[in-house]
Amino acid sequence: MKIIVFLAVLMLVSAQVCLVSAAEMEHSSDNELSSRDLVKRFFLPPCAHKGTCNH
């Protein structure tokens, strides 16, 4: 049951990221990096930014 809730939250967050990035793209069409930056911020663990993940 928890997995379903987690997936629902994840879908909501991803939808919000899409909306925010779309709004940012409208405001600043020359700044392509913003949407990719947002996706990285939301979907990668913090250690991925520093490159300290141990797999």
From Swiss-Prot:
Disulfide-bonded cysteines: 47-53
Alphabetical UniProt keywords: Amphibian defense peptide, Disulfide bond, Secreted, Signal
Any single Gene Ontology cellular-component annotation: extracellular region
Free-text tissue specificity from the UniProt record: Expressed by the skin glands.
Major subcellular location class: secreted
Keyword Ligase: no
GO biological process, one term: defense response
First and last residue of the signal peptide: 1-15
Localization (cell): Secreted
Propeptide stretches in the record: 16-41, 54-55
Designated name of the protein: Riparin-1.5 acid
Lineage: Eukaryota, Metazoa, Chordata, Craniata, Vertebrata
